[in-house]
């Protein structure tokens, strides 16, 4: 606002360039104060603009306050709705995760059941193989025992044969010696009964008589020896037939056992091939399943997934002892 030099009149502004007298003083001002419309004539344009600006500022502040309150209410509603949506999203995510986890658990349980079934089948195969191996060892031991028994029987037969021959020869010698003694006693008796006179008269024929008796005794000894040899030969032939029949029976059993062993060996070969195939397939399955677990649950610590894929069981101590080679 521009003042005049006399400080009594005022110029409104540089635009209107109107001179406005100063406001009245004293009683005059009090009289016109009650009638406020006239009061405005004592204000400059700037004062009016300032009043309007203040009114506008108050309205702006009021609107801004209302707008802020509306913004706060809208933000509260938005946050409430966002929290509700977030809660719904979290609940949905939890439900989805739980459903996915249940599905994965069901898949893992099915796979675990399959692995248990495969392990059970493998255990059965291993048990069958161990039984086959045990049966093979028993057959081998039985075959060895049978061979040893046959050898022992043959040695006993040979020893019995030698003892029978020895006894027969001793019996022949004893019988021949007895026959010779009997003939000698008979000759001596004949000599005694005929008398000394006959002996004197027949000195020349005594040597011939002795020779004839010796020849006759030799013939008797040969006949007795042949008869004894025939009897011994018959006994030996009978023993040999018995031993041969026993040996043939043993050989037949041995042939049957060899046939059974060949069949069992063939079956063992087939079972071994199946065992190797199943072992390789089981290892591949376990490796693939372990990769799936590592990919699906990368944060699992060692041992936390044993309920899904347990470690392979070791061979029991009883079976391990049975599988050790025997030192019979």
From Swiss-Prot:
Protein name (database record): Uncharacterized protein C6orf163 homolog
InterPro entries documented for this protein: C6orf163
Biological source species: Mus musculus
Name of the gene encoding the protein in the UniProt record: Gm136
This protein's record includes keyword Coiled coil: yes
Top-rank taxon: Eukaryota
Coiled coil: 67-190, 223-251
Keywords of the record: Coiled coil
């Amino acid at each position: 606002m521009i003042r005049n030099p006399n400080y009594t009149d005022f110029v409104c502004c540089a635009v209107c360039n109107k001179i406005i007298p100063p406001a009245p003083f004293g009683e005059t001002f009090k009289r016109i104060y009650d009638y406020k419309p006239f009061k405005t004539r004592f204000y400059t344009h700037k004062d009016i603009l300032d009043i309007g600006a203040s009114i506008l500022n108050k309205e702006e502040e009021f609107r801004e306050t209302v707008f802020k309150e509306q913004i706060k209410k809208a933000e509260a509603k938005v946050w409430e709705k966002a929290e509700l949506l977030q809660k719904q999203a979290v609940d949905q995510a939890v439900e989805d995760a739980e459903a996915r986890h249940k599905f994965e658990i069901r898949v893992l349980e099915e796979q675990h059941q399959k692995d248990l079934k495969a392990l059970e089948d493998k255990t059965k195969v291993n048990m069958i193989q161990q039984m086959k191996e045990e049966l093979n060892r028993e057959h081998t031991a039985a075959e060895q025992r049978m061979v040893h028994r046959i050898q022992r029987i043959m040695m006993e037969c040979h020893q019995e044969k030698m003892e029978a021959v020895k006894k027969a020869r001793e019996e022949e010698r004893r019988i021949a010696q007895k026959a010779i003694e009997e003939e000698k006693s008979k000759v001596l008796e004949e000599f005694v009964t005929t008398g000394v006179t006959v002996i004197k008269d027949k000195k020349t024929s005594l040597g011939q008589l002795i020779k004839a008796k010796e020849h006759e005794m030799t013939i008797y000894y040969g006949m007795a020896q042949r008869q004894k040899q025939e009897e011994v030969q018959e006994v030996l032939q009978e023993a040999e037939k018995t031993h041969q029949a026993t040996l043939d029976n043993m050989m037949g059993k041995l042939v049957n056992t060899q046939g059974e062993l060949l069949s069992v060996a063939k079956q063992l070969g087939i079972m071994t091939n199946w065992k190797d195939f199943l072992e390789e397939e089981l290892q591949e399955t376990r490796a693939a399943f372990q990769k799936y677990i590592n990919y699906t649950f990368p944060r699992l610590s060692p041992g936390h997934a044993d309920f899904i894929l347990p470690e392979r069981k070791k061979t029991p101590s009883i079976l391990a002892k049975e599988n050790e080679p025997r030192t019979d």
